[in-house]
Every structure is written in structure tokens, then in C-alpha cells.
Amino acid sequence: MTILPSPVSRLSISSRVAILLAFQVLIGPSAHSQAAPPPSQLTKEQIVQRIDQAVQQRTDGISGYTVQEQYDLYRNSDPTPAAQETIKTTYTRAVGKDYTPIAQSGSSLLRSTVIDHVLAGEKELNLAANREGTLITSKNYEITPQPGTAEVNGRQCVLVTLKPLRKSPHLFNGKMWVDSTDFTIVRLQGTPSQSPSVFAGQATVARDYAKVDGFAMATHAEAHSHTFLFGETTLKIDYTNYKIDRDPTASH
């Protein structure tokens, strides 16, 4: 990079990368895996295999969906969002994502340079040609199950660590909690495996999932970053009103 980004560009890059990491795993595991033996009876290789199967079943099972997404961007310790945007997202497997704005408030500059930039990047990531390379599977990550189980959001989960097999701002180092019975994603935490710019602050992501019509879908995400001039920035996203179109040809 030869041109030093403006302050707004720095904020845009940090927030964009963080939330893109959260968004890209929306195409995550499903809740249609067959019942499995307790994790204690499975080898690490078998657990990874079950996670891969759950991801594939979700990819095959959902032909499309719509969801309402609420974006709230915060600066430092200010309890009032500096910018907000509500959108309706329409996803189809063949095409990817499309957005319909519902409401906007706060700084138009921050919306255009951060939130709208994030949405544009997410749209690119969800193109059919790009989607396979962002899935949380053993093709893209070294997945290492940890011993035992833990309760997360009222569900018994297996914790696995994630290490990308290649450097990419679209992949991340982190942790994932999967349901111990069907190996669908429950929670994700991570940081980019590669910063897009030496000027961008470190970004971290946390994202929660719940079963909607039998599939694991994102319900809440938070991306935190820090820049020299802007300090702490947080982008919060809430997902509601899912309507899922199942693929009738998919096996369950």
C-alpha cells in the first residue's frame, strides 16, 4: 500500500474486516446432521468430519432466505450509536446477497464508509464463485477439537480452535463452539489471519447462532477494533425475521 488512508478510511478498513469475518460464516453449519455418539466417544478426526458434514448439509439444504439486519456503529464509550442502518437482506444460492434499505440515521459519512462498505464486501464474498473458500471446513482450516464440553447459550457444546490453512483477510484465527449432538455452530470468536493494511487496527469478532427452521443462523454479532485516531469502535448487528427457503432436492 503506497497511500496512507484517511482517518475515515482507517476506521472503514478495521470495522469492515472485522464484521466481514463474522458475516462470511453465515454460510455455516446446519442443524440437519444425524444424531452422533457423545463427543467423548468420537476421535478428533470424527468430530472434524461431523463439522464438515454439517456445513455441507446446510449449504445443500438452503436455497435462499431473507432476514432483517440492524447495524449500530459506536465510537469509544459513547452509548449512542454514531450511525445506524436497517436493511433487508435477500440471499439466493445461485446469485448471492442483495440489500434493500429500510431505515438510516446518524452520520451519513460513517454509514457510507463503514456500514455500506461492509455490505458491499459481504456481497462479494457471497458470490457463488467465492463462497466455498470462506466456509469453516477442513478445506480452509486446521480444526482442532478440545477436550470435554461446555454450555453455551443453553446448549452443550464442543470447543474447537480454528487456524486458517492460508493467509487471507477473509479467514481468521479463533474458536468455534458447536452443538455436541449435531455439530452445528453455536458461537464464533476470532481475529483476521491477515490484516489488509499496516494502518488498520486489530479487529475481533464474536457471533452467536440459533436454530431457525432447523438451520443454524446468525442472531447477533459484534466487531471491535481500535485505531490510533478514533480509539475503540464497535459495530453491532442483530438478525431477525428470518424466512428460509429449503432446497426440496436436498437429503436430510
What does each of the following model-derived ranges do?
Residues 188, 219-221:
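Beta-strand-dense domains in secreted/periplasmic systems and polymorphic toxin scaffolds
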Residues 1-14:
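N-terminal secretory signal peptides that target proteins for export/translocation
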Residues 34-173, 180-185, 193-203, 210, ...:
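Structured extracytoplasmic
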Residues 3-4, 31, 90:
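N-terminal compositionally biased, intrinsically disordered segments and leader/signal-like regions
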Residues 16-28:
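Bacterial N-terminal signal peptides
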